Regions:
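Short, surface-exposed beta-edge/turn micro-motifs
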Residues: 1, 62-63, 72-73, 98-99, ...
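A glycosyltransferase accessory/donor-loop signature
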Residues: 1-4, 10, 16, 28, ...
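Alpha-helix N-cap/loop-to-helix initiation residues
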Residues: 11-12, 84
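Short, acidic, metal-binding catalytic loop of nucleotide-sugar glycosyltransferases
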Residues: 21-29
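Active-site-proximal specificity loops/subdomain of glycosyltransferases
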Residues: 30-69
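Short, surface-exposed amphipathic charged segments that create phosphate/polyanion-binding patches used
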Residues: 45-53, 115-120, 187-190
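GT-A fold catalytic core of metal-dependent nucleotide-sugar glycosyltransferases
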Residues: 61-110
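Conserved catalytic core of nucleotide-sugar-dependent glycosyltransferases
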Residues: 94-158
Length: 226
């Protein structure tokens, strides 16, 4: 199973814990690849100029996922601030080949004006849909509309609103695969498979007491002790 994780040099521990939690719970073999912006630039796959509104180094490189998967089969992209409590392979049960991409369709409106590191918290329709994507890399809309030129030249809103796919080709996934800490509650999903620390995770002092933060900290300590 192909997994791509956004990598940010400022949040290495977040990536490490995300990866460890994936491996802890999976029942299938995972091919996990961090998408590092420097590597993408070195390979001439990414040449966008710096966007001061980008809150992470993978704000746009995430959309290289189909290219990196050779436009074959299904691939998952997720932000590095995900923490897995269950088996990611179960998401494959929701595959619908008529769809170009499948996401959790939250109606998310951030309460905070800034993100965990002080970056401006921009608001736009379909916010956070692109933070976890099950992508049908064989789909015509993906192959035609998520090219290198698209990723490097289209606007951020075009990419993050998934406007490279028609609405009828954007499938829905359960909240369990992208539970937004601070937004969702146990009424929405009593036992999430993946917690997304989108406001800020326990690797930041001010966010150590967030929901499911104790589980993240326990996993991170296990990595340190290995």
């Amino acid at each position: 199973m192909k997994i791509f994780i956004g990598w940010d040099s400022r949040e290495k521990i977040a990536y490490q814990v995300c990866r460890a939690s994936l491996l802890k719970h999976t029942t299938v073999s995972l091919d996990i690849t961090p998408i590092k912006q420097k590597d993408m630039r070195d390979r001439n796959l990414y040449w966008r100029g710096h966007d001061p509104m980008s809150s992470t180094e993978f704000t746009f490189t995430r959309f290289l996922t189909p290219y990196l998967a050779d436009y074959k089969g299904w691939a998952v992209f997720m932000d590095c601030d995900f923490f897995w409590r269950g088996d990611i392979s179960t998401v494959m049960d929701y595959r619908d080949h008529s769809n170009a991409v499948m996401v959790v369709k939250h109606d998310y409106v951030p309460k905070e004006a800034t993100k965990m590191d002080g970056a401006i918290q921009t608001q736009y329709p379909r916010k956070n849909w692109s933070s976890f994507m099950l992508i049908n890399c064989d789909h015509d809309q993906v192959k035609q509309n998520l090219t290198l030129n698209t990723v490097n030249n289209e606007s951020g809103l075009h990419l993050h609103r998934l406007q490279w796919a028609t609405d009828d080709c954007i499938g829905n996934l359960p909240v369990a695969y992208n539970y937004l800490e601070g937004w969702h509650t146990k009424d929405d999903c009593p036992n999430p498979l993946a917690v997304h620390f989108t406001r800020g995770g326990p690797w930041f002092v001010d966010y150590m007491d967030v929901e499911y933060g104790d589980e993240w900290i326990k996993t991170s300590r296990g990595l340190v002790n290995e």
